[in-house]
């Protein structure tokens, strides 16, 4: 009996690696889409935090400009610009992750039709 189970296992493995037996890809694509959506949400949260940080730096810069301390004002302005650049980068990463999730959902739909 063990010999037959082993042979059956080998046959299933061989046919699976040759592509004759398709594993259920739908669940895999759905999991990947969920992971990409979670990643996008993480990037969007980071972008929100960086935007808030940039706003704080801008306020500080304005305060120093009112006090005629232009070196400090320039420093805070540079930090604000840097934070905004990072936020834009995070948003582009989030968009890429959302696009990948959407593609995985499309693949999952196609896999269900087969």
Feature locations, PLM:
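Extended amphipathic alpha-helical heptad-repeat regions
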Residues: 21-114
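Classic N-terminal secretory signal peptides
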Residues: 1-21
């Amino acid at each position: 009996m063990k010999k037959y189970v082993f042979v059956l296992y080998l046959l299933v493995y061989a046919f699976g690696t040759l592509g004759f037996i398709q594993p259920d890809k739908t669940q895999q694509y759905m999991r990947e889409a969920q992971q990409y959506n979670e990643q996008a949400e993480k990037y969007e949260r980071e972008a929100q935090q960086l935007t808030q940080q940039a706003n704080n730096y801008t306020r500080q810069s304005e305060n120093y400009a009112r006090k005629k301390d232009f070196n400090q004002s320039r420093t805070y302005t540079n930090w604000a610009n840097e934070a905004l650049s990072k936020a834009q980068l995070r948003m582009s990463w989030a968009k890429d992750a959302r696009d990948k999730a959407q593609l995985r959902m499309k693949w999952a739909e196609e896999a269900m039709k087969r």
